[in-house]
């Protein structure tokens, strides 16, 4: 579940009753604010980097057409919250995206807090900020008026603990078989909560077919690698790199896969590439050290074990690696 809390904690908002925006809201021609918003949301719902960028462009055009069009500000808040959370996950600069989300969410709420589109954006934003209680409350208010709002059902499921056996997530996929977050969320829940790696792989595969992106190919590859399907995993990591040649996690995971295949030089090369793109991944330093040790270069192994310990900062999730690194430093004579 999400662990990051940001400035939206301070957002003063009273959530009251709201009305549902009907299709009449989009009756304007495609060049009007409503039409541009509709096009922007279609791009957003592709859940791809290119779709997000296009959505921002269209939402800004909608605001230019009508500076008081609340839905467009809500759309910007949505997409910026997704982009901020993504960058937080991959350990890249994210604060500007959350600040943009906050600014646009506040504007949408100021103009018309009761629109379904505004409430949905608010629910998404709460979810991305680990405000699960508020996300659930907001989603439930939407569902009280519109029981088949796919996105609200998904938010409610996610904010309620992401139970992979819940009928809610199945209902989302029945209502909208192309809703990418549901496939990714369910795959992650199956992977981490049930260790049902085969099932998780199928949902990651479906997500990659609908919305190919570096992030999804990387997740798909890791699910394959966990089951020992190393060559297939390599293929997915290479697809991730093709989608985004600057996506550090794909190089890191590609390197780890080569390590498991005893291709230590290829492991080291890919880990160094990952670090050159983003130095904030402790795993990369650890597997470089492992690779050097396997390649009979103890001096470099010690250097990278020590770098791993510096970067990991004794985070609990790296406790096992840290214990191993300290033991190997001592065994290799690097503790002197």
Each predicted region: which residue ranges?
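Helix-start (N-cap) detector for alpha-helical repeat units in TPR-like alpha-solenoids
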Residues: 33, 70-71, 116-117, 150-151, ...
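Structural signature of tandem alpha-helical TPR/SEL1-like repeats
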Residues: 50-57, 85-107, 128-141, 160-171, ...
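Alpha-helical segment of the N-proximal tetratricopeptide repeat
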Residues: 34-61, 65, 181, 185-192
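Residue-level recognition of tetratricopeptide repeat
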Residues: 41, 78, 124, 158, ...
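Structural marker of alpha-solenoid helical repeat scaffolds
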Residues: 65, 111, 145, 175, ...
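Terminal, low-structured helical/coil segments at or just beyond the last alpha-helical repeat
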Residues: 294, 299-336
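TPR-adjacent "capping" and linker segments in tetratricopeptide-repeat scaffold/adaptor proteins
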Residues: 25-37, 92
């Amino acid at each position: 579940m999400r662990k990051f809390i940001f400035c939206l904690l301070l957002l003063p908002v009273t959530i009251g009753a709201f009305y549902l925006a009907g299709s009449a809201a989009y009756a304007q021609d495609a060049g009007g604010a409503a039409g541009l918003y509709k096009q922007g949301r279609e791009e957003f719902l592709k859940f791809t980097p290119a779709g997000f960028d296009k959505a921002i462009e269209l939402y800004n055009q909608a605001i230019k057409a009508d500076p008081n069009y609340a839905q467009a500000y809500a759309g910007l808040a949505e997409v910026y919250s997704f982009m901020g959370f993504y960058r937080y996950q991959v350990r890249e600069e994210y604060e500007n995206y959350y600040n943009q989300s906050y600014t646009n969410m506040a504007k949408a709420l100021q103009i018309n807090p009761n629109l379904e589109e505004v409430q949905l954006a608010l629910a998404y934003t709460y979810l991305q900020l680990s405000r699960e209680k508020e996300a659930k409350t907001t989603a439930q208010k939407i569902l009280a008026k519109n029981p088949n709002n796919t996105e609200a059902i998904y938010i409610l499921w996610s904010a309620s603990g992401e139970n992979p056996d819940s009928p809610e997530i199945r209902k989302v996929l029945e209502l909208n078989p192309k809703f990418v977050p549901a496939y990714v969320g369910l795959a992650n829940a199956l992977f981490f909560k049930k260790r049902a790696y085969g099932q998780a792989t199928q949902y990651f595969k479906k997500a990659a077919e609908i919305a190919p992106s570096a992030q999804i190919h990387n997740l798909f590859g890791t699910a394959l690698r966990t089951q020992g399907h190393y060559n297939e995993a390599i293929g997915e990591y290479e697809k991730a790199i093709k989608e985004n040649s600057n996506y550090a996690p794909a190089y890191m995971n590609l390197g780890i896969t080569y390590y498991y295949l005893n291709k230590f030089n290829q492991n080291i090369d890919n880990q160094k590439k990952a670090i050159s793109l983003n130095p904030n991944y402790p795993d990369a330093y650890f597997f470089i050290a492992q690779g050097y040790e396997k390649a009979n270069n103890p001096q470099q192994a010690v250097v990278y074990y020590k770098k791993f310990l510096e970067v990991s900062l004794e985070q609990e999730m790296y406790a096992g690696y840290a214990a191993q690194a300290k033991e190997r430093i001592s065994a290799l004579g690097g503790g002197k």
